[in-house]
Design a protein with these regions (language model features):
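N-terminal small-residue-enriched
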Residues: 1-95
């Protein structure tokens, strides 16, 4: 059993806590305490993100409740989410 971390209800990705192979089942806990499972369709490196729903090209990628990038292509639920399919939207820091 492989677990992942989903912090915020707005998240559309979860962070896996172990190496994931295509076909593995990954679980995450919902805010109400229930568990949801997702079938990995690509390998996912430990501590990387897995899509927990389909994300369309141009949609926001949300991790820990924060907008961390935009999908550079359509991403299917169960796919590895990383720099190969997400464009950064970093903003200049004002200090």
């Amino acid at each position: 059993m492989i677990y992942s971390i989903k912090i915020d209800p707005k998240d559309n990705v979860a962070v896996v806590t172990d190496e994931v192979k295509a076909g593995d089942t990954v679980f995450y806990k919902n805010p109400d305490g229930s568990k949801t499972e997702i079938k990995a369709i690509t390998p996912v490196t430990v501590y990387h993100k897995i899509a927990i729903c389909d994300i369309s090209r141009g949609d926001k990628v949300v991790k820990y409740g924060e907008h961390i990038g935009e999908a550079s292509c359509d991403i299917k639920a169960g796919e590895h989410v990383h720099t190969h399919n997400v464009e950064s939207v970093r903003e200049d820091l004002k200090i």
